[in-house]
């Protein structure tokens, strides 16, 4: 089958073949980072370790201030060095077991743990940032091959919400559900910039999953949601839908990654509604599509068997300002052994 993501990279002019479905990432490849000063962080880490069988040597303990949305570059650099010193060589990915902080100066905390703090991944105003070496990569061992460890937060509006998100991720493995990807063409011109890709996504990936392009601001009462991509400040009626285990949903807007902000809808609302992962920016990104997930890449890679953290991370070209939250090991389309 023609590979959509390659076509996008070269302005839809080249073709390639999608890879065979892959096996899910393993517990030995994931490390959980715990903030020992945060009681909820300790509980989340313990719950996730048990649910996913993460080895004890992959439990990394740090100390950070509790309750702050952001930490500074200097403090983060100290913490990051401690994390690197505790990380076994087999680890390819980090699961960050807390909801705050979610920002490091001008970077998201997931990007800071992935790349190390680097102002090349930041931007003041409407400017590009450094491209991720992981973007649309076929790497299965990012630490070994690219010297990065993609990171995802185990975060939520409440402790019980985080537990539920983890449970949905575990339940997703090998499910191969009858599902739909919903691509919303909204009335918000500034935030609807991804919609130009929708026709070719639908044309090329409909054999892998049912895809519906919906010309509306609201999707409601659907019972088969695996993907929901839209562009709005606030998305109504999301709780009316049934999100299948492993579902990915996000809304392209400026501050969705401000987890507890009120100016715009937080990405946590998707998780409250039943999604297993979402994405949002922590710093004003402007409407660069490169700073948000490319729906075609996510859909293609996820339905071809990659884990959630792989497919989602690989879909963002400029992720420095973007926050990934979800259950990283969820693999609804992976081959099970």
Language-model-detected regions and their locations in the chain:
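Bacterial N-terminal signal peptides that target proteins for export
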Residues: 1-9
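N-terminal signal peptide c-region/cleavage motif recognized by signal peptidases
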Residues: 16-18
């Amino acid at each position: 089958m023609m590979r959509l993501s390659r076509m996008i990279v070269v302005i839809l002019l080249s073709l390639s073949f999608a890879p065979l479905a892959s096996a899910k990432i393993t517990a030995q490849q994931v490390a959980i980072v715990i903030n020992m000063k945060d009681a909820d962080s300790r509980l989340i880490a313990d719950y996730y370790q048990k649910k996913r069988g993460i080895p004890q040597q992959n439990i990394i303990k740090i100390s950070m201030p509790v309750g702050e949305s952001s930490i500074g570059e200097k403090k983060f650099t100290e913490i990051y060095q401690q994390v690197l010193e505790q990380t076994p060589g087999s680890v390819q990915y980090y699961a960050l077991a807390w909801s705050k902080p979610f920002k490091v100066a001008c970077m998201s905390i997931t990007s800071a743990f992935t790349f190390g703090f680097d102002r090349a991944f930041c931007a003041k105003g409407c400017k590009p940032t450094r491209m991720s070496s992981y973007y649309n990569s076929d790497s299965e061992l990012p630490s070994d091959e690219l010297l990065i460890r993609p990171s995802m937060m185990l975060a939520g509006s409440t402790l019980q919400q985080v537990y539920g998100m983890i449970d949905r991720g575990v339940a997703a493995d090998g499910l191969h559900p009858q599902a739909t990807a919903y691509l919303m063409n909204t009335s918000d011109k500034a935030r609807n910039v991804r919609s130009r890709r929708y026709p070719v996504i639908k044309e090329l990936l409909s054999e892998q999953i049912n895809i519906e392009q919906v010309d509306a601001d609201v999707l409601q009462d659907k019972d088969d949601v695996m993907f929901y991509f839209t562009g709005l400040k606030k998305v109504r009626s999301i709780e009316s839908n049934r999100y299948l285990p492993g579902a990915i949903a996000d809304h392209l807007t400026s501050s969705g990654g401000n987890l507890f902000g009120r100016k715009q809808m937080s990405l946590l609302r998707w998780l409250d509604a039943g999604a297993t992962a979402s994405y949002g920016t922590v710093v004003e990104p402007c409407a660069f599509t490169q700073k948000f997930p490319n729906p075609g890449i996510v859909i293609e890679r996820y339905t071809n068997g990659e884990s959630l953290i792989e497919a989602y991370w690989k879909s963002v070209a400029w992720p420095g300002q973007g926050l990934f939250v979800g259950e990283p090991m969820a693999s609804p389309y992976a081959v099970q052994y």
